Structure formats: C-alpha cells, structure tokens
C-alpha cells in the first residue's frame, strides 16, 4: 500500500469534489469535515462520480442516471445501480490529503 498525495485541505472546501487521475480514476469528496474516496466511475454507467451531486448523510448522486451511493461504504443506495463503488482510505496529515492505494492497481 502507498499513499497518493492529492491536495491540501485548503484546496478542497467542504462540499467539494475532485477527480484524481489514477488507474482507475478516484473521486475525492469533502463532506462535513470528513474526506471520502471512491472509484470515479459509476458502477451502473460510464459517468464520473466526481461530477455528481453531494447529498446529505455523505451520499453522492450519479450525474447520469441518478443512482446514489454511500461515500462511507460505497454501497449503491438506489436503482439503477446495484453494485457498490470501491472505497479508498483517506489520510489527512499536516494539512495534506492522501489516498491509500494498492501498489498493484
């Protein structure tokens, strides 16, 4: 496992999202003081989750077909999506945000 530097806390305001170019791309969200990272591709269609709509209770709605996902677990919360999004651990250290990724990705 390795830590991928993304940005500083100041660069991602509360309610913000950022696409992290990686293989696969990762969506990073800042919700209510917490940071969450999930696969950036909707499990139902070819849409960028980082362009989705951040909602209450740390959920995000896909911009294409309105599928909704829990950012904490990646679980698909409503149709048309049924498969979860992969989640990634996020570490904040000295004001910097890192995503923990597998070196095998």
Curated annotation (Swiss-Prot):
Quote the NCBIfam families the UniProt record gives: 3PPDioc_HcaC (NF042948), PRK09965.1 (NF007422)
Q: Does the keyword NADP apply?
A: no
Residue sites binding [2Fe-2S] cluster per the record: 42, 44, 62, 65
Where does the Rieske domain start and stop, copy by copy? Answer: 4-99
Instruction: Give the co-factor note.
Output: Binds 1 [2Fe-2S] cluster per subunit.
What's one Pfam family here? Rieske
Q: Which GO terms describe its biological process?
A: 3-phenylpropionate catabolic process
Q: Which family does it belong to?
A: Belongs to the bacterial ring-hydroxylating dioxygenase ferredoxin component family.
One function term, GO molecular function aspect:
2 iron, 2 sulfur cluster binding
Instruction: Kindly state which keywords UniProt assigns to this record, in alphabetical order.
Output: 2Fe-2S, Aromatic hydrocarbons catabolism, Electron transport, Iron, Iron-sulfur, Metal-binding, Transport
This protein's source sits in the domain of life called Bacteria
Cite the annotated pathway: Aromatic compound metabolism; 3-phenylpropanoate degradation
Q: Do you know which InterPro entries this protein is assigned to?
A: HcaC, Rieske_2Fe-2S, Rieske_2Fe-2S_sf, Ring-hydroxylating_fd
Needs which cofactor?
A: [2Fe-2S] cluster
Q: What is this protein called?
A: 3-phenylpropionate/cinnamic acid dioxygenase ferredoxin subunit
Q: What does this protein do?
A: Part of the multicomponent 3-phenylpropionate dioxygenase, that converts 3-phenylpropionic acid (PP) and cinnamic acid (CI) into 3-phenylpropionate-dihydrodiol (PP-dihydrodiol) and cinnamic acid-dihydrodiol (CI-dihydrodiol), respectively. This protein seems to be a 2Fe-2S ferredoxin.
Q: Partners and quaternary state?
A: This dioxygenase system consists of four proteins: the two subunits of the hydroxylase component (HcaE and HcaF), a ferredoxin (HcaC) and a ferredoxin reductase (HcaD).
